[in-house]
Amino acid sequence: MDNKTRKSLDKFYTKKDTAKHLIGVSEEILGVDLTNSPTIEPSAGGGAFSSQLNNVVAYDLYPEIDNVKKQDFLADFTIPNAENRIAIGNPPFGKKGTLALQFLNKCGYLCKAVCFILPSTFKRWSVQSHIDPELRLIYEEDLPLDSFEFDGKPYSLNCVFQIWTREMCEDMENLRISEKPAISHPDLTLWQYNGQEPSK
């Protein structure tokens, strides 16, 4: 696969030490042994996460390593049943995060928790408002720019690691932005760039 194709498929891989750190964070936050828990990695890429997990089913549209099933995860297919399953990984982002949103919502339906590297825009209400309303955001961490690699070389991306749950860790604070932030203030009016009407 050439570099142009890799970029078009968002094949920017997570560094293994970053994945190891995020697996540890997920275990601490969720209170589980993620290494041995039923887990799926829906877009395995270079296997940064799945290679460090013992009870994982990994998928990728174009597998590049062994033990990864060739599968379009967003297509309609049968996934083996597993109780208290957790999803973890670095899904393809797509334009304006649209693919990442689809991966998050599907994994949120199939799993008790979703631990994903996502575009930094997922910290905004405008994106969170499109996430399954049944999911709760219980953790987020900004990632260093050098957490990724492309074609074996360091690659910088503005990303956040978030943990979303369904019927899990319900005693933890929900960090999800539930309402559209106010854009008006008694002493300030926001205008569109053309100056014709207030922003809405």
Predicted segments with their positions:
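Class I S-adenosyl-L-methionine-dependent methyltransferase catalytic core
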Residues: M1-K200
